[in-house]
Amino acid sequence: MRAFSEAYLRRTRAGMWADSRDALADLELASRERILDVGCGSGELTRVLAEESSGTVIGCDVDRSLLEYTRGSTENDIEASSKPSVSVVQGDATRLPFATDSVDLLTCQALLINLPDPVTAVEEFVRVSSDLVAAIEPDNGAVTIDSTVPQEATLEHRARNAYLEGVETDVTLGVSARDVFETAGLDVLSTHRYDHDRTISPPYDEHALTVARRKATGAGLADDRATMLQSDLTGAEYDDLRSEWRAMGRDVIEAMQDGRYERTETVPFYVTVGRVQP
């Protein structure tokens, strides 16, 4: 399973569910008594669940440091309300430390795309949940870029395709999560799409400036070099892409200096809800 830092998770999930929670309607959060959020990471979805439900909410992750962050952030968010605090438990998604039928809703967000065997995890979810299982997973193959630097979208598309071919897990799983659910024995109730927009516009924060600098130096692309070279991309083709990538990064920095740079990345997520068969 791929691991991510708390800062990365917060940054990439910032703003999710702030605009609309309609895609979560079939989770029936208001009526849930006990919810388990598996692979909770830094707790972005966990906090939404706690806000929308009066029941018990538990965050579970294999990374203890992420759990400590989630515990602290959720306590700060709801301490002024009458809702109970969110509890956290360390555990592996494929071997959950929970009894059979111990929750009535089990959720995960951007977890299955990082697992080599998502079906095994969902089978474990079926064991632990007495009623519903919901997976909120992206289709990273359908990400779109709208940028004021014309070549940025094209170059990111080329880099993403190479990464998708080289990565060892199915990072496009969101669009086909229904198949995983059915294989694991769930009755699929619904699938709803939710588009998560990540926007950069003036005034630029420090993170946006850092990303631009990493484009110009090629450092951002280099982070994924090994994975990209597991695809059909040759070393020479990677070097050509990196050269174009760095030139694009310099154009981004120039546009930022004039306050002309704007970019929106849209990541489609799919909320798949299934019911445990009696």
Each predicted region: which residue ranges?
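A short glycine-rich, Lys/Arg-flanked "PGG" loop and its adjoining helix->strand segment in the class I
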Residues: 119-134
